[in-house]
Regions:
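C-terminal and inter-domain tail/linker signature
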Residues: 1-284
Length: 284
């Protein structure tokens, strides 16, 4: 039997709960045998390739992720909005971390959990955390010598636990991505839609294959969107974040007497920098 929205939300809530009390075993057991964690998006993903019995072993890529980024820190989450559509759960959160060195940082993030059923139970198949790695690094470095020491310690920890490939995979989240260009594109998307400037809107998109999901799970071509759900729609965006080749935001959409508030994700073509897809999540 397919899990209900309440059951899926309860499943993903167990993730920050396990992190808060440093229950490694409980956290690892939330994920499927083939789960992937990309935290943040833009860094190299951590993919499981082991069977069920070995899922929580030291060879588990998710276990190495835990030991690198969770074990030495105290992490808490404040959720501002939870959205469930189909098998996906989206959360608008603030992540607070007290690092092992004593430095405290706050990172706004949008989380996408994709779930699946495994042996009759709901499991997390993918966790994609959209937050800005550059912003986090700036917070740490702003602490002066303590911050510099913290970054050096993190680098050595990654090298020890994940090897050179893991360190380089994490660093690519700082050097590769859409960054400010993505945030500008999202603002321009909303402005063009609100102005009914179809030419400007189409100019932001990566050709005819660009899909608009409004709501998420219902993919349409740009023209179908403009002629249907996007007609007479006004969208305001805030809280823009870029991670890798994607940008995300909180949105408020109005069409007549109907208002939706949720989280949107824009994916960009790395070659062109144009919008490849736009997905709008709200509780329908």
């Amino acid at each position: 039997m397919r899990a209900t929205s309440e059951e899926l939300l309860e499943l993903v809530n167990r993730s920050p709960a396990a992190v808060a009390i440093h229950d490694r075993k409980a956290w690892l057991e939330l994920f499927s045998r083939t789960a992937v964690v990309q935290d943040p998006v833009g860094t190299a993903p951590h993919r499981r390739t082991v069977s069920g019995d070995g899922a929580a072993s030291g060879d588990d890529p998710l276990g190495r992720f835990w030991e690198t980024f969770i074990a030495p820190n105290r992490i808490s989450f404040t959720s501002y909005q939870d959205i469930v559509i189909g098998d996906e759960v989206v959360r608008d959160v603030l992540i607070r971390s007290e690092l092992g060195s004593g430095i405290s940082i706050e990172v706004p993030a949008y989380l996408i959990y994709r779930t699946t059923e495994e042996n009759g139970e709901a499991r997390i198949e993918a966790l994609m955390a959209h937050w800005e790695l550059r912003g986090m690094v700036r917070q740490v470095i702003a602490a002066g010598l303590a911050g510099l020491s913290t970054m050096i310690q993190l680098g050595w920890r990654m090298l020890k636990i994940q090897g050179a490939a893991g360190l380089l995979g994490f660093a690519q989240g700082i050097s590769r991505g859409i960054f400010g260009g993505g945030r500008r594109a999202v603002r321009n998307f909303a402005a063009a839609l609100n102005a009914r400037d179809e030419k400007a809107l189409v100019g932001l998109l990566d050709g005819e294959e660009t899909l608009i999901e409004y709501p998420a799970g219902v993919g349409e071509s740009v023209q179908e969107f403009l002629d249907g759900a996007g007609r007479d729609l006004r969208i305001d965006v805030s809280g823009l974040t870029s991670a890798g080749w994607s940008s995300s935001c909180v949105f408020r959409a109005n069409r007549g007497d109907v208002t939706h508030r949720g989280v949107a994700f824009f994916e960009f073509n790395p070659k062109t920098g144009k919008v490849r897809s736009a997905r709008f999540f709200w509780n329908v």
